[in-house]
Each structure stands twice: as C-alpha cells, then as structure tokens.
C-alpha cells in the first residue's frame, strides 16, 4: 500500500472496462480500483477484468469488501465465509481452537481473492457491537472489545500469512449508533473516556498489525465538532499521535450521506484536495474513497 500519498481510488460500472474508465484509471493520480458485486460474475471474468485494469495501469491496486457473512462481494465459485459474529461466538465457546480457525478463515479469504489478482480486502471490521447498529450487527466479532481484539488479530494474521494487506474499520467505532451512515448522519453523544474504554480498544491493540484503517462517517459532538472523516482531532491527534498509527487511512465512500458537509459532494472533495499538499490526502472524484497517508509512512504490520 505504498505510494498512496495524494492519490485516488475509483470504482467502475460493470464486468468489463469501458474506454472512458480506461482513460480515468490511466491518470497518474489514480492508485486503485475497488470492485463490487456488480463487477463480478465468476473467477474467470474477474481475472479478465483485473487484467484489463492492470494492462491499462500496471501499478494500480485492486481492492474489494470481502469481509465474510453478508458483506462478501465475490460469491459465485468462492467459499461462503462465515460472519465475524459467528467467528466471535466460536471464540466465546472454544477460545483455543477458535484462534486457529479464525486465522484459517482470514487466510482463505485472502488467498481466494489473491488468486484472482486482487491486492487487498477492506477487512476486518473492528467495531464493537452493542446490539444498536443494524449496519454493523453481525459484521462485528462481538460486544466484548477484548474478544474483538483477539479474534481480529487472528484474522489479520491469516491475511498476512496469505501475503495480503488488511484494512481495519470503522475507526473509532460505529457499533454504538443506530443510524446508518449510508443514508443518515450518525451521531454518538458519549465522551472520549467512554470511547477509549470501549470502542477504541481494538484499534489501540491492533494499530501495529494493521496496514490501513478506515474511519467511520459519523460525529462525536461532545468530543469534536468535525465528523471523524474530516477531523484533525481523530485522525491526527488520536490515530497518528496517540495510537502511533503510521499506515494508510482510507475514508469510506464520500457519496454516503454520513460524509456530507455543508455544501455538496464537490465541496467534500475540495475539502480534501485543498489539504492534500500538507496532509497527504487524495479524493476519489468518482465518489468512492478518500485516501490519506502520512508522508513517509509505511504499512503498520
């Protein structure tokens, strides 16, 4: 995940690459493409699609949301992976054997996408489930932050054993709010001490193991006036300085409702690009991802 400084990640429309998309991804400011279910029919097709992409831009990286459970973009001809909640339940019932199994699931997920020439998955989810957020729910390992930390560490080890990078999400924790940031503006009224003693624990334990982190599109008004996506407090002071994270920071989809600021989508993009020279922030003009990386920073583990 090197050389992401000030560059962009885009999505594409279908199962083949259009001429317009070839022009977009050949731009030197584009570093990656994220694939969705709409881009996948079977393994042969997606390999061909990725070959088209990399023939157009050889150094481009390919990512996918292949978490397991209900968020698994590639399904046909792939092993159906268990949800993280199912793995967490196994961890609660049989901790010793679960660690090895969870590591194997992480390895399997990463190996399958690697064999299709995908470079990384936006996984694992590190949110602590408080039985509040339907958008998180069974995507979380557990309602116990320590169990989330242990299970996620094993999952990450499996990903790394397969030779791929990992992305922990959604910093500093999306599991305690009901609103879905895809269609709403989630807000959490808790204090910083409450967040540090609960939701932040998995991120604090795992920063040295994570190659990248994705912030949540949500606000903590009693902690900082800015949403996490745009917050110097959360991204610089807490994540970079306090937790010593040196890897890549991906934003979630900027077209989501939770990413809106006063103005419109273009204003959100301009907010990032105007800071890019100082902070290493790039924006996906197609509406998918923000990429932020500290100058000189490398992968976290």
Language model regions located:
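Catalytic domains of carbohydrate-active enzymes, especially glycoside hydrolases
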Residues: 24-35, 117
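Active-site-proximal loop/short-helix segments
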Residues: 74-81, 119-139, 143, 165, ...
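Conserved small/polar residues in nucleotide/adenosyl-binding loops
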Residues: 272-280, 297-301
């Amino acid at each position: 995940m090197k050389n992401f400084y000030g560059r962009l990640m885009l999505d594409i429309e279908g199962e083949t690459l259009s001429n317009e998309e070839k022009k977009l991804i050949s731009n030197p400011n584009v570093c990656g493409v994220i694939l969705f279910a709409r881009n996948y029919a079977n393994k042969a097709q997606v390999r061909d699609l990725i070959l088209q992409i990399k023939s157009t831009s050889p150094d481009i990286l390919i990512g996918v949301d292949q978490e397991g459970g209900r968020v698994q973009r590639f399904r046909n001809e792939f092993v159906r992976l268990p949800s993280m909640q199912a793995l967490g339940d196994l961890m609660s019932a049989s901790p010793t054997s679960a660690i090895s199994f969870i590591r194997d699931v992480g390895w399997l997920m990463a190996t399958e996408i690697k064999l299709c020439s995908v470079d990384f998955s936006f996984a694992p989810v590190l949110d602590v489930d408080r039985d509040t957020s339907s958008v998180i729910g069974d995507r979380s390992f557990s309602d116990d932050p320590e169990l989330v930390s242990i299970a996620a560490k094993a999952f990450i080890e499996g990903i790394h054993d397969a030779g791929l990078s990992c992305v922990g999400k959604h910093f500093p924790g999306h599991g305690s709010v009901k609103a879905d940031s895809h269609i709403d503006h989630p807000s959490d009224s808790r204090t910083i001490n409450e967040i540090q003693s609960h939701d932040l624990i998995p991120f604090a334990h795992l920063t040295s193991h994570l190659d990248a982190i994705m912030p949540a599109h949500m606000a903590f008004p009693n902690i900082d006036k800015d949403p996490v996506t745009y917050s110097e407090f959360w991204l610089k002071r807490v994540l970079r300085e306090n937790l010593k994270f040196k890897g890549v920071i991906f934003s979630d989809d900027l077209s989501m409702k939770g990413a809106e600021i006063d103005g419109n989508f273009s204003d959100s993009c301009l907010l990032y690009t105007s800071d890019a020279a100082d902070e290493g922030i790039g924006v996906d003009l197609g509406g998918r991802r923000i990429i932020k990386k500290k100058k000189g920073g490398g992968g976290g583990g």
